[in-house]
Each structure stands twice: as structure tokens, then as C-alpha cells.
């Protein structure tokens, strides 16, 4: 019957929209128009979230949840090459783009390299830019890992998603030109609103080692 044909075409159209990321389906609720995902460069250039979004004409605003000096745990000390218990600046921020919460990030830096950082307002300021202008600390390279994780109840509430919703966990260590680690951060991006771009290059075998230096 004509109705069945129309229904088949309609369903196929919805599937096509889902594949293109233009719609999303939730069990028990139906199909909705999806918000376009924010594109972020992951490996081709080392920029912070603020610089990345500001460069697209959408500068983020941060709600600073925690900003303090704490003793480094063994894990944080390992990333920053400090002794456990050494003082680090800890900053937790919920980052908004166009009024929507998109990223929950915890950042750790050696307190000795950036005195007074715990008192700086980062609501609408780039951390990387401030490190460069206030302390002469210019980040030269970084190492990032990416994985999918479910949102905890706390994370879901802050990011306005359901508990268990997929988040993209980005772990990063940033280094100065002399190889000293200056920042470790742990960022949770909303899976429904984030899209990362990766640029790959082909190199000769004897050049691979230099990329990991």
C-alpha cells in the first residue's frame, strides 16, 4: 500500500539523518534533531580549548568549580615529574559554548613554576595565553590519549546529560621546549556534542622516533 511505502521512505530518511549526525534517537522518547557537533583539532596543532573555540568565533566561558593549591598525588606527580606531595595548582572548570555545558576539565600545574596562578580569574581567559604572558611558559608539545567513558551521576548533572551517557575522556600532558612537563589535564567532553579531527602524516622509518621525542 502507498502508506507502507511512505513509511519505509520516512524510516530510511531518519536513518540517513542519524548517519549524518543530523538527528538522534533515544529509546522510549523518539527521534530528535541533533545539535551540530563542535569540531576540535586533536593532534595537528597544540591549542587549548579556549584558543580552539575562539578561533572558530565561539569563545567559551568557564565556571570555575575549584582553584587551589594541593599536594600532588602519586599519579599527578608522575605526569609532572614531581615528588609526591609537591605543591600543584589544581583548577576544575565547567566550560560552556553558546551557553551550553560541553567540557568538564581538571587541570594540574607545578605551583613553583607559576606562583599566584591559583588566584587568577579564568572565567573568560585562556590558560595557555596567561602562562605565556605572565610566566614566559610557552607550551611546545603535548601527549594526548582519548577514550570513551560513561558519565557518572556528578558528571552527568554538570554536563546536562543522563547518567551513563557516553563522554569522551581526553588526557593530556603538555611540555615546554626543554622537555619539562608543565601541565596535566583530564577533560570530559560530551559525546553527543564533540567531534575530534586527527591529521595523519606518513614518515620514513628513521623519522618515527623523532616524533615521539
Question: What kind of feature is each model-predicted range?
Answer:
Residues 1-33:
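N-terminal helix-turn-helix
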Residues 35-213:
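All-alpha effector-binding/dimerization core of bacterial HTH-type transcriptional repressors
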Amino acid at each position: 500500500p502507498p502508506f507502507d511505502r511512505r513509511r519505509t521512505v520516512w524510516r530510511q530518511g531518519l536513518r540517513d539523518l542519524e548517519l549524518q549526525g543530523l538527528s538522534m534517537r533515544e529509546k522510549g522518547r523518539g527521534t530528535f534533531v541533533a545539535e551540530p557537533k563542535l569540531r576540535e583539532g586533536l593532534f595537528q596543532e597544540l591549542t587549548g580549548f579556549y584558543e580552539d573555540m575562539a578561533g572558530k568565533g565561539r569563545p567559551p566561558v568557564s565556571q570555575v568549580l575549584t582553584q587551589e593549591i594541593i599536594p600532588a598525588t602519586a599519579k599527578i606527580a608522575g605526569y609532572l615529574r614531581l615528588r609526591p606531595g609537591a605543591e600543584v595548582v589544581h583548577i576544575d572548570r565547567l566550560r560552556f559554548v553558546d551557553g551550553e555545558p560541553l567540557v568538564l576539565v581538571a587541570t594540574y600545574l607545578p605551583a613553583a613554576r607559576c606562583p599566584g596562578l591559583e588566584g587568577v580569574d579564568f572565567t573568560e581567559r585562556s590558560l595557555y595565553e596567561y602562562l605565556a604572558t605572565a610566566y614566559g611558559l610557552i607550551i611546545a608539545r603535548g601527549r594526548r590519549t582519548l577514550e570513551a567513558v560513561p558519565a557518572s551521576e556528578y558528571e552527568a548533572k554538570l554536563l546536562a546529560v543522563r547518567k551513563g551517557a557516553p563522554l569522551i575522556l581526553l588526557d593530556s600532558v603538555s611540555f615546554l621546549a626543554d622537555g619539562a612537563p608543565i601541565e596535566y589535564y583530564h577533560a570530559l567532553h560530551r559525546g553527543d556534542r564533540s567531534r575530534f579531527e586527527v591529521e595523519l602524516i606518513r614518515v620514513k622509518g628513521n623519522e618515527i622516533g623523532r616524533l615521539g621525542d
